[in-house]
């Protein structure tokens, strides 16, 4: 069975760093946009936590997981096969 493709953690980290270091400071602290950015950060952190839970579940079920950097990796493999 092929490994289950999942996003590399760096994708989450890059988005979180951008939102926390740049976007939060670009919007007014008392604005609705500030609250939306805050909620987006929370959602990304939850998504990363859920992905880690999925990986643990796969490990317990002896299913391989492969962290992907891009969709191009998939296309490259499909071309090879």
What are these regions (language model features)?
Residues 1-30:
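N-terminal acidic leader/helix
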Residues 33-81:
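Low-complexity intrinsically disordered segments
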């Amino acid at each position: 069975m092929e490994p289950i493709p999942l996003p590399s953690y760096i994708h989450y980290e890059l988005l979180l760093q951008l939102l926390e270091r740049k976007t939060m400071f670009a919007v007014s602290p008392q604005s609705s946009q500030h609250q939306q950015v805050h909620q987006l950060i929370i959602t990304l952190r939850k998504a990363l936590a859920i992905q880690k839970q999925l990986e643990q579940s796969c490990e317990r079920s002896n299913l391989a997981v492969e962290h992907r950097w891009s969709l191009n990796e998939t296309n490259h493999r499909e071309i090879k096969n």
